Amino acid sequence: FVPVVMSLAVVSTLWMQIYSPEGILNTLLANFGIDAQPFIHSADQALPSIAIMSVWQGVGYQMIIFLGGLQNINPALYEAAEMDHASGWQKFKDITLPELKPLCIFVFITVTIGAFRMLVQPMVMTGGGPDHSTYTIVYDIYETGTVNWEMGLASTMAIVFTIFVVILTIIQNTLTKDKEGRKHVHKKAKTN
């Protein structure tokens, strides 16, 4: 979970060292007889390299969410499945996945929004290059407003981006409702 609480600038700097031509990743590749890769210095590899770093940095947060979801599943559901002689796959398919559906949608939406609002990683690692291959929406808004001093355009871009995020949130809320229109809310049985 440590990467989640680390500063994005620190994580980006760490991964710049990992991705450098003399870095640990290219050293490992050389040990397997694979040529050194340009990673963040190649227009084709820069964005996927930053995406891998972002996944590594954020996966602990998603694990905590799913762990909480797994612990919130009523054990009686699994006990009933045991009595019906359900296989492990059937329990997973018919109990675990449906119970985790709202969390899966939440994680998907938050990861998508996080990918769209990525700024620090490409700024620190590549400066938006090479050939603007790591230019993100937020990076473009930032540069339009602070470098080019086009505040009106940057504000408009930010408003459009906010509307897009709101639309994604509405989609999330729509997808997490069941057929009767109720939200998936898990309540633990009260014990007296």
Give the predicted meaning of each segment.
Residues F1-N192:
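A structural signal for multi-pass alpha-helical bundles of membrane permease subunits
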